[in-house]
């Protein structure tokens, strides 16, 4: 880590519940969430996540390609460094199977 590098928080640490029945959604469950993040080229992206019953985590680049994926994350897990090649919008996508419920805590940052 460089002397002048700084941690830029993209998503503050937050906790929430996933998997509840939601009649407003097409699948009838709140089982997929996406979080867009504005990123800068030349940096690295990190995501810290933990859940009670397992959650699938995907990081998607600004072209729509999956650059990192981890299935069934339960204990505290840091995904990264994921190199950022172009300035733009990347996305963090979280998912659980329909009917599964889990409590999720996550945050994301660039260095």
Regions found by a protein language model. Give the residues of each.
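A general secondary-structure signal for short beta-strands and their flanking turns/coil
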Residues: 32, 42, 52, 101-103
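Hydrophobic beta-strand segments within beta-rich accessory/binding domains
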Residues: 36-51, 57, 90-96
């Amino acid at each position: 880590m460089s002397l002048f590098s700084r941690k830029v928080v993209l998503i503050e640490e937050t906790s929430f519940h996933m998997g509840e029945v939601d009649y407003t959604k097409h699948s009838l469950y709140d089982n997929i969430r996406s979080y867009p993040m504005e990123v800068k080229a030349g940096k690295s992206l990190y995501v810290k996540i933990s859940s009670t019953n397992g959650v699938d985590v995907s990081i998607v680049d600004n072209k729509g390609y999956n650059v990192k994926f981890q299935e069934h994350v339960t204990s505290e897990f840091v995904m990264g460094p994921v190199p950022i090649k172009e300035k733009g919008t990347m996305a963090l996508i979280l998912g659980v199977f329909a009917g599964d419920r889990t409590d999720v805590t996550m945050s994301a940052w660039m260095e």
